[in-house]
Structures are given as C-alpha cells and as structure tokens.
Amino acid sequence: MAAVDIRDNLLGISWVDSSWIPILNSGSVLDYFSERSNPFYDRTCNNEVVKMQRLTLEHLNQMVGIEYILLHAQEPILFIIRKQQRQSPAQVIPLADYYIIAGVIYQAPDLGSVINSRVLTAVHGIQSAFDEAMSYCRYHPSKGYWWHFKEHEEQDKVRPKAKRKEEPSSIFQRQRVDALLLDLRQKFPPKFVQLKPGEKPVPVDQTKKEAEPVPETVKPEEKETTKNVQQTVSAKGPPEKRMRLQ
C-alpha cells in the first residue's frame, strides 16, 4: 500500500477549540495554535523548547530549526501564522502558512497545490466536454458523420407526423411482379395445394390423378347399333338436289 502524504491530508481538514475563541488575540494566538490536539502543530519545533524553558519568543532568533511566528493579525477575526525553517538569525525558509478565521484553523495551500488543482479542474472540464460531444456524434457509412441532439428528438416527438400516402403500383410493376411469381412457381412448384379455403392442403400428385378423365366403357350392343346406322346412311347416298323453278 502506497504511503499517504500527510501534507495533502492537512489541506482538507480544519481544527477549532471553542473554549479559546472568546479570549483569542495577538498575544494568545500562538498558545492556541500550540494545543496538543492541533494536527497542524509540530511538537519538535523551537516554540515548544522556548515554552518549556519559559523563555520569550525573542530567543527564537538565536535558535536553528522549525519555528512558528505570527505573520499577520486582524483581531478578532483573522490571524496568519507561518511555519518556517530558521538557518541563521537572518536567514529563514518558509514552509507553510496557516490562517485562523473565527477560531477555525486551516492550512493555506501552496502554489504547487493551487496550480495542480486548477489544472485538474480544467482538464476535467475539457474531458467532460469531449465526452458530452462524443455522445451526440453519429456515423453511418452512407451518411458520414453528423450531430444528433436530444432536443431534436423531443421536437420531433411533439411535432405531428404527416401520414405517408400509399402510392398505387403501375401496370409495369404489377406485370413484372406477376412474371417473377410465375417464374418462381415454375422453378419451385408447390408440394401441397389447398383446393378450397378452409380445407386441408392436398398433395399435388393426388390432385393430378383426380383431374385425369376416366375412359368410358362402351357395351358391344351399342357398338353394333352405331355400325348399322352408319351403313344405312352410306347406302342411301347423298340427298338429291331439287331443281329450281325458273
């Protein structure tokens, strides 16, 4: 597990002791800041040594190490305390600033933290804008790219849709469709046919057998009768033509 930077945690917390607020001033603000429950206070600082030896704060200038000083005071609301590294009586390195507003202590962010926060905020905004834009982008091979917004969908839903008129087919279209259906019927003949609506489909072979005419059987007596009639007609010969009267 990665180690957590304590300084980053201190930027997001605050500390307050309500019992000190009524008596808080320029002379007591450092004592208030040096409370044991204050997470911003470093107990290895020179202020703690001076406090234990009951010396004045002027002795801090003669010491080397971490110390806290009152940088600015605007009683009774605002106090600014600086944490610094003293290397000599005339040389110090600022480490952090703390501001007290109405008794509540906060750590002031350093320049790097401010820039980092601003950059992250800007990048997050740009990324959100790109994500939002990509959600409205559409693509189709035949149309290409276009924008599709939800407002257009709502307007299309509210707008009454015109009923599309069905155009009648032309004679050429009907003839062409009939020719295609006939061609398909010849290539793929049906195996079952429904003779009448509602009846059970019947195989095509069975319908062909029923459609074939049954040969009639002629009795021998009827054959002889027809022969005699034919002979009688042939014996008489053709009827004579009557002469026209002039």
Swiss-Prot record:
It comes from the Eukaryota. Residues 206-226 have a biased composition (Basic and acidic residues). Its main location: nucleus. There is a cross-link at residue 208 (Glycyl lysine isopeptide (Lys-Gly) (interchain with G-Cter in SUMO2)). It is found in: Nucleus. Transmembrane segments: none annotated. GO terms for biological process: regulation of transcription by RNA polymerase II. One of its GO terms (cellular component) is mediator complex. InterPro entries: Mediator_Med6, Mediator_Med6_met/pln, Mediator_Med6_sf. Residues 193-246 are annotated as: Disordered. It holds the Pfam family Med6. GO terms for molecular function: transcription coregulator activity. Belongs to the Mediator complex subunit 6 family. Component of the Mediator complex, a coactivator involved in the regulated transcription of nearly all RNA polymerase II-dependent genes. Mediator functions as a bridge to convey information from gene-specific regulatory proteins to the basal RNA polymerase II transcription machinery. Mediator is recruited to promoters by direct interactions with regulatory proteins and serves as a scaffold for the assembly of a functional preinitiation complex with RNA polymerase II and the general transcription factors. This is Mediator of RNA polymerase II transcription subunit 6. It comes from Pongo abelii (Sumatran orangutan). The lineage of its organism: Eukaryota, Metazoa, Chordata, Craniata, Vertebrata. The gene is MED6.
